[in-house]
Amino acid sequence: MADGLASSPSSPSSPSPPPPLHPFTLSPLQHLKRITPIILITLIGLVAYYPTLTLNFFWEDPFDIGQVDSLSYFQLLTAPNSNSYYRPLALIILKALKLGANYSAFPYHLFNVAFHLLAAVLLYGLANHLFKNRAVAFSAGVLFVLYPIGYEAPARASSMHSLYICLTLIALWSYSIARQKDSRRHYALTFLCAALFPPLHENGIMLPPLIVVLEIYLLWQYKLKRSFIALIYFVPALIFLVIWFSIPKSGEAPAIGVRGFEALYLSQGISFPIARLMSQLNGFGLTAITQALMAAASAALFLFLTRTRYSLPPLVLALIWWGVAMSLAWIARPIEYLEVSPRVMYFPSWAASLAWGMILLDKEKWRRAVGGVTVVFVVLQSWTTLQQSTQLYLNGSRWMDQVITIGKGGGRLLFVNAPDRFMYREQLYPLGYWGMLVAPVSQDLSDFVRFTTGVTMETKSLSDFQLMQPMMDASPYFVNTRGSANAHASDVMYDSILWADKVMWTDYARDGSLTIKYVGDVRPTLLTSTLIGRIGDVADVAGASVMRDGNLLRVTLLWRSLSAAKPTDTIFVHVLDSSSTLVGQGDGESLNGLLPPSAWRSGHEIEDARVIIFDSPLIAGEYRITVGMYDRADGKRYKAFDAKGVEVSEGELEVGRVTVK
């Protein structure tokens, strides 16, 4: 066979494929044996990625997707994407996935997850085709579908990464068939993939070098006739580069260069099992750089020392593929970009998965046994790490769900201690930021509301680090907040509260959940003329509402500021049973601590929402809710008076009652 498989049986590095079986000659059992790995890879991927389908929009999705609204499909062909990029096909797909008047995240996540699973199946097919070993192919497919280090890519709604990995794998598989069978149809399919990839993402210019690497491997291992046909696949990439460089760019030009630290960071994409193990073992007290170096060296030693002459060439192929696929990110992006963009690890992830799956490609039983144990370890580790990342993204997305639900009511909202990004305290890998970018300051929170509901409203974001610190001490996260300047007890905080219709506070729980709650409002004019009572000469209690919700009471107080309180003055809210025994309390400054009474401005109306949580259910009976103020310096309470001006006992003004049946 001039252009067929002409490998020498005497060469230990040359694959020896069995004769092909026609599908119609296979028995049902043989059919089942063929499709079982594909079914298993798909099922594993569905279980792992099902939660991803429930994610909302985050990061810069409103801009990246929303920019297509004002343009026709034809105009998208000439529109630069995200400042310095040209991705017309990506924009066309993003526009097509908008299925209603407003945007829903589900079609975008379904698109990405579906192509991620398809890519895993295609990797299985490519590996099985090249190496004729179902165990290697299955391991590579499972490792890819669970690849944990680049989860950001398939999890982000506006991402096209899963699709263009599919194009890459189809192109390589098709080219291999074309060279072995001299099939024009497969050459054409490869060219189609090479033409479609660059308009999706600039990583498409790396597909021709990947094909050239495969051509060299086929010449080396399959003894095919020399051919220069691989060079034709550079044509679409060159045309794309001409167009890309001719587009006016408002963003910063890529900082082209070869950098050692960036290479070390990116090496975690191939050394990920060992790099993860280093972090799980707390790095043995070593610096992050030393950990990454040790992980890279250990991974290289393990992969090469466990290879024989028979299995070394496929490993070399996978590693070179990984390096080529990673090279554009390495030479074009500085570490400041890379370390907060783990999605760059995703494009080469199929080659990394192939390299680790390759440890099963051996003739010696003991080597295959070692390889099998290693693959099982990496799969289990990848599964647990992926679940951690998925849970992190779910928590961030649930927070965004709350933003949108609250925001669709319109008006002006002030968000306090809202996350910009957050990550686990336990670093998943030695170098980099392995968290979630929820809502960077480049996007206003109102953008997400308008994008998904069509409601136009306004938001501001501020941080109060002093009030946030106790939550952070108990939280599993490190958090960067929106409005990074500390506005604690400042005029900026007060004026922003005046500007807002509602003030929304983010709670960070021990279990990692993020909850937004309404904490109050301040109005410069009085909207209420009622009176419950007065606390000293500092404030009137104009109104109150009490609502029981399971094991908690929601108490909302309406204060009218009369004169300045002392800096040490604070508020108490008590829950008393029928015998006047204290059974619960919600003491502290107004608006969840944001505004101490000393900050109140005379004549302003302060709505103060509090939540009192009980450790156990309240027993049946009637409960009184009382309020007052005291000086923290000496514990002395202010006198309190009812609406008729009569002084009440113990400085406790009753503002409501609740009955538990």
Protein language model annotation of sequence segments:
Residues 2-10, 27-462, 472, 482-486, ...:
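Polytopic membrane enzymes that build or remodel cell-surface glycoconjugates and lipids
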Residues 3-8, 23-26, 404-412, 418-423, ...:
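C-terminal luminal/periplasmic domains and tails of membrane-associated envelope-modifying transferases
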Residues 8-19:
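Ser/Thr/Pro-rich low-complexity tandem-repeat tracts
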